[in-house]
Amino acid sequence: MEFILPGALTGSCPAWPPDVFAVAATLMRRTGSYVRCLATGGKSAVSLLDERWPGRAEAIGGAWRRAICAALKEHAGSGKTSLESALLRATLPPSVTQAWSTLCNRAGTSFGSCTADDALTRSLLELSGYADEASWSIGLESAGDEQDEYGQAAQLFLALNDKQSFCHRVHPQRARVLGKKHTPQQGLTLRSLTHHLSLCMPWEVEPLWFDLDSARLDDVLNLLLLPWPLEVKATDFQCVNSGSGLSELRGDSLFEYSRPSRPDSEVERWVLDAIERAKRQVSKLHAVVLPELALTRSEWKIAEAVAIRSGVMLISGIIDDTDDKSGLPMNSCRIQMMSLPTRPGAETVAAAPPPAFRQAKHHRWCLDRHQVLQYDLGGQLPSALRCWENSHIGDRRIFFAHLGGWLTFSVLICEDLARQDPIADVLRSVGPNLVIALLMDGPQLAARWPARYASVLADDPGSSVLTLTSLGMCQRSRPVGGGGAGSRVIALWKDKLYGTRELELPEGCDACVLSLARDTREEYTADGRSDGKATEVTVYSGFFPVPAGSARNP
């Protein structure tokens, strides 16, 4: 306890619920004692929580939040020091302080004995539940809502923690607490215990949370999918020497995928033309999405400027990025989401170009003999060797963004969907209701690997998944035995309510609009608490191919 929250054993119960949750959840994760929320078997196995627990947790959590809001409203000014002083004045519900005292009194209990200690385990479950109920909508509400003192404080603490945690006294290097969209409805893990708070351990992956509730988002979300490049040449793949000789010692090879950057004027014309053609299919467009390795850095800047002028988000893989520290080549994606129009009454986007978020790929692509033959690359890459992408693996981060009051999304790059460690724990803890996977892959058929891994995320935590590849790679992908035309299934959609859909571009079309809608469902925590049918599920709502324009596209 002292490691997570210095001074925990000598002071009173922390007033800020995410701090209390960080302590309780970390201890439950370390000991596995969260399983005691259920009667799991045996002649005398009894749940530590009775049938009145859901209502009691909601009432006490609500009282805790009201106490904090009252203290902040009466005593807080602006800034961290003022908030600290106000939180110290909050009068916490007796049930919260009693559970905290029980926990502190048993601080000497060994990890191996925790689960068998009824009083200790009950206090952990209660503190977690109270903090979760007190933190409804954390990270999911506008920071500018003057009527929500709790939400304003949460946003300030998030900013002070560099977008890594909503905690106040718990340092992000000890435990991180973020918001949450989905609660797993199968299995029993620590993630099953909360609706609103997620524990992210400060290990390999750094999660970052952005709340853009001021952005205007309708109940229908229209994404323009640009499966660029439309043509991929075999000569775009080249063997390279790493300089270290490590790959050669293992009997492997390295390759890079590259192509010349296109003129600025052409890129601007292509993106503008695609947006204009898409708006003939739908009246409103919210985002433009391109696959892995779709744009160079210079092309991104032009496309980003067009997106900002057009009031749409832009998400794309970058082909020629480099690591800031080492200068080595890096496979990454960039996300510009500040370009969305703001809702009435919200602050407008600044006149200067807003910064885009960059996320690096966490795993390298490996082409084996089967894939070299499948993509007809045998004249460029040695099919007898494993060919690894020449890409630097540096700091691992994952980005979560909340938009428009209901959408929380994150982005993965190809192998990061399939090789889910070490990112899976963070992704499942937060449970975004949309995951966008940018791929450099063959056709997105329901029988192939992207669909399998999308199904895993749809099951736990319940995320909807979009996978998108380039038409060029689809066309290069052929059965190894020969024969068959290249596929035009450039994307795949999976949600937990309505299943899987392949998105195929008809001949004569070079883009499509995917329409998504918000559906609501009720989810329960493992300790029996309902969210009141407040869970928002992103579901398929339509698919509209965009006929090719007269301009020569990439």
Language-model regions: role of each:
Residues 226-232, 238-287:
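N-terminal glycine-/serine-/threonine-rich phosphate-binding loop
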Residues 174, 179-201, 361-387, 398-400, ...:
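Active-site regions of metal-assisted phosphoester/phosphodiester hydrolases
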Residues 262-361, 451, 459:
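Cys-nucleophile CN-hydrolase/nitrilase-fold catalytic domain and related Cys-dependent amidase chemistry
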Residues 234-246, 342-354, 499-519, 523-526:
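Acidic Ser/Thr/Pro-rich low-complexity disordered segments
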